[in-house]
């Protein structure tokens, strides 16, 4: 029977000093026999997805203590990608994922905590905490802050989100008044941005991995139903502790739950719902932390057989996360995948003995449970607020239309191939990724002329100066994990291409990455990256590039001999940008770049460089 990890600091004569300090935090004699459960919160006033989390850690703490545990809360950092975007702040976004993972490890191991409740929400916070959970492999449960309500304005017939505000701002034909109206309407409440962007994608994937409660990814941040998720998480983590430490039940540990099959389930969900390409990066990173042999080839394999069953902004303007919830949330998509014979349903979760059991209970098309139906009727109130659980609005009906609704059956899928694809070729030998859900079918095969930019900044200037024409393939390089450093998101270049009317007339290829808000023929994560000697660094202005999504290929139409000669020349010059970039690369960023791997490895640290230390 495993001992509580916390016994290291709570038991024995020699730990009198440690116990004295524990007592100073409020612990009593009886508490030293209970599991100490860390609450990793990520409250910050910088991020709308986290601004409402301040008191939620203590909400969970009280429930943990009622259930027989001792709760100790700490905080991690959280970067807002939208606010950090378009300037050097974006250099820090992806590196913050590693800092968050380390922070959770540091706090949990330094204080010998027995389990963790991860209160996350936005882009790098959920992945960072997931990496830590799989690294530590002690009982864990995730509960996120929830999605924002979609914005509303009389100037648009559809719901708004952050991307709408960015696109309209770049449209030279839009009046200042229209831009101001979109700006004030796009992000009306607390919560993670309302489309299927990175934050919401990752929170949905924690459900598929089995590490979060049903509704975690889709219940609105403002809705009173979300409070119950936090309360249930507090009770559940104590139960998981009892099963592991009291009954030696290792099936409750993160690596037992989030195994190879669970990672396949998560990736199949991502493909089926057209999630952010960033999720590929983060799943690969989490798999490495959990020592799961899941890689880009597995994602490529799955992308060829999973249909797209859900389409949400930015891939379609009609639906946002509140509509996914009304259609039954993530377990309705998982149910469709299960009935299609794809999902692994024999896996345990933190809340059910098996995924099959959970689907039977939570898929609205399979259950008559009125409480479940009521839960998924939770909807938006349309009232601007930064307060969690502040409204109890419900839809009159559910969206259970699997032919024409937000979530579809296999027979009525949006497309028979899913919303994400991995491409390989001489320009990306280790692969690159594209969100096909956001690509118009007319350009699934695209041959274009390379237009080279050595940074995101120069690409933005070129696009706005009309240097990019229809038929061009914008190449933005030296923006990978090592070359950026930090692998910036390219939402501004894609938004500006869209505002220039080039969304269906151009492509963009980069060793950087894309926001979950990106759509269009935007191909990222080109690996190896330019700074690591990748062939994207050998492309020249005027070269022809052929993109073929159906055949999963991307090739520079240059002979092998010519590429070899260019490589010799580039080796002599060094693999660095041809232009001087006015960005300040600090010691912190240099330290990140030193150990960073390319995107096909999840941009995690190169552990081989640390061997022997």
Curated annotation (Swiss-Prot):
N6-carboxylysine carried by residues: 124
Cell inner membrane as UniProt keyword: no
Family annotation (HAMAP family): IlvD
Protein residues bound to Mg(2+): 81, 123-124, 489
Organism lineage string: Bacteria, Pseudomonadati, Pseudomonadota, Gammaproteobacteria, Pseudomonadales
Catalytic reactions of this protein: (2R)-2,3-dihydroxy-3-methylbutanoate = 3-methyl-2-oxobutanoate + H2O; (2R,3R)-2,3-dihydroxy-3-methylpentanoate = (S)-3-methyl-2-oxopentanoate + H2O
GO molecular function: 2 iron, 2 sulfur cluster binding; dihydroxy-acid dehydratase activity; magnesium ion binding
Organism (species): Pseudomonas putida (strain ATCC 47054 / DSM 6125 / CFBP 8728 / NCIMB 11950 / KT2440)
Active site, per annotation: 515 (proton acceptor)
One Pfam family in the UniProt entry: ILV_EDD_C
GO BP annotations, alphabetical order: isoleucine biosynthetic process; L-valine biosynthetic process
Gene3D superfamilies: IlvD/EDD C-terminal domain-like (3.50.30.80)
Note on cofactor: Binds 1 [2Fe-2S] cluster per subunit. This cluster acts as a Lewis acid cofactor.
Name of the protein in its database record: Dihydroxy-acid dehydratase
Keywords assigned by UniProt, alphabetized: 2Fe-2S, Amino-acid biosynthesis, Branched-chain amino acid biosynthesis, Iron, Iron-sulfur, Lyase, Magnesium, Metal-binding
Top EC class for this record: lyase
Domain of life of the organism encoding this protein: Bacteria
Cofactor(s), by name: [2Fe-2S] cluster; Mg(2+)
Subunit structure: Homodimer.
EC numbers on record: 4.2.1.9
Its biological purpose: Functions in the biosynthesis of branched-chain amino acids. Catalyzes the dehydration of (2R,3R)-2,3-dihydroxy-3-methylpentanoate (2,3-dihydroxy-3-methylvalerate) into 2-oxo-3-methylpentanoate (2-oxo-3-methylvalerate) and of (2R)-2,3-dihydroxy-3-methylbutanoate (2,3-dihydroxyisovalerate) into 2-oxo-3-methylbutanoate (2-oxoisovalerate), the penultimate precursor to L-isoleucine and L-valine, respectively.
Gene Ontology cellular-component annotations: cytosol
Binding positions for [2Fe-2S] cluster per the UniProt entry: 122, 193
Gene for this chain: ilvD
Pathway assigned to this chain's UniProt record: Amino-acid biosynthesis; L-isoleucine biosynthesis; L-isoleucine from 2-oxobutanoate: step 3/4; Amino-acid biosynthesis; L-valine biosynthesis; L-valine from pyruvate: step 3/4
Record has Zinc as a keyword: no
NCBIfam families in the record: ilvD, PRK12448.1
Family statement: Belongs to the IlvD/Edd family.
């Amino acid at each position: 029977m495993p001992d509580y990890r916390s016994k290291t600091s709570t038991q024995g004569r020699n730990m009198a000093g440690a116990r004295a300090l524990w007592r100073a935090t409020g612990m009593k004699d009886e508490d030293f026999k209970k599991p100490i459960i860390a609450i990793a919160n990520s409250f910050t006033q910088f991020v709308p997805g986290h601004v409402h989390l301040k008191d939620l850690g203590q909400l969970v703490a009280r429930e943990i203590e009622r259930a027989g545990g001792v709760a100790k809360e700490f905080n991690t950092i959280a970067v807002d990608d939208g606010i950090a975007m378009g300037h050097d702040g974006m250099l820090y976004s992806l590196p913050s994922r590693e800092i968050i993972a380390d922070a959770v490890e540091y706090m949990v191991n330094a204080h010998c905590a027995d389990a963790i409740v991860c209160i996350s929400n936005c882009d790098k916070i959920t992945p960072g905490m997931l990496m830590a959970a799989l690294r530590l492999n002690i009982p864990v449960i995730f509960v996120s802050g929830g999605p924002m309500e979609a914005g509303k304005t009389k100037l648009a017939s559809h719901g708004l989100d952050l991307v709408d505000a960015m696109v309209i701002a770049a449209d030279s034909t839009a009046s200042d008044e229209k831009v101001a109206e979109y700006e004030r309407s796009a992000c009306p409440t607390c919560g993670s941005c309302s489309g299927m962007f990175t934050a919401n994608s990752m929170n949905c994937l924690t459900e598929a991995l089995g590490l979060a409660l049903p509704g975690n990814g889709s219940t609105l941040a403002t809705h009173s139903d979300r409070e119950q998720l936090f309360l249930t998480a507090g009770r559940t983590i104590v139960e998981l502790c009892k099963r592991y430490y009291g009954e030696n039940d290792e099936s409750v540990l993160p690596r037992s739950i989030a195994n190879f099959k669970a990672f396949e389930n998560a990736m199949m969900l991502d493909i089926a719902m057209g999630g952010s390409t960033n999720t590929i990066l983060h799943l690969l990173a989490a798999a490495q932390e959990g020592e799961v042999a899941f890689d880009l080839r597995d994602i490529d394999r799955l992308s060829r057989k999973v249909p797209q069953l859900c389409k949400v902004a930015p891939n379609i303007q009609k639906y946002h996360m509140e509509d996914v919830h009304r259609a039954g949330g993530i377990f309705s998509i998982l149910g469709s995948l299960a009935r299609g014979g794809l999902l692994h349903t024999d896996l345990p979760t933190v809340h059910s003995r098996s995924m099959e059991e959970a689907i039977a209970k939570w898929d609205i098309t399979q259950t008559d449970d009125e409480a479940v139906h009521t839960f998924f009727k939770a909807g938006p109130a349309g009232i601007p607020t930064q307060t969690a659980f502040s409204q109890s609005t419900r839809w009159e009906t559910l969206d259970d239309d699997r032919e024409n609704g937000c979530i579809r059956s296999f027979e009525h899928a949006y497309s028979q191939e899913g919303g994400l694809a991995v491409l390989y070729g001489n320009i990306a030998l280790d692969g690159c990724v594209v969100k096909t859900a956001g690509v118009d079918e007319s350009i699934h095969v695209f041959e274009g002329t390379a237009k080279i930019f050595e940074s995101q900044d120069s690409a933005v200037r070129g696009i706005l100066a009309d240097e990019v024409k229809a038929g061009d393939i914008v190449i933005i390089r030296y923006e990978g994990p090592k070359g950026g450093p930090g692998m910036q998101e390219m939402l501004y270049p894609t938004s500006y291409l869209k505002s220039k009317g080039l969304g269906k007339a151009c492509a963009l290829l980069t060793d950087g990455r894309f926001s979950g808000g990106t759509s269009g023929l935007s191909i990222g994560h080109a690996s190896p990256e330019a700074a690591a000697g990748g062939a994207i660094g050998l492309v020249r202005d005027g070269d022809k590039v052929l993109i073929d999504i159906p055949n999963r290929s991307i090739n520079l139409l240059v002979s092998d001999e010519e590429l070899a000669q260019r490589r010799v020349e580039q080796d002599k010059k060094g693999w660095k940008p041809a232009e001087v970039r006015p960005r300040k690369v600090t010691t912190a960023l240099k330290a990140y770049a030193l150990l960073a791997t390319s995107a096909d490895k999840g941009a995690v640290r190169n552990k081989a460089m640390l061997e022997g230390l």
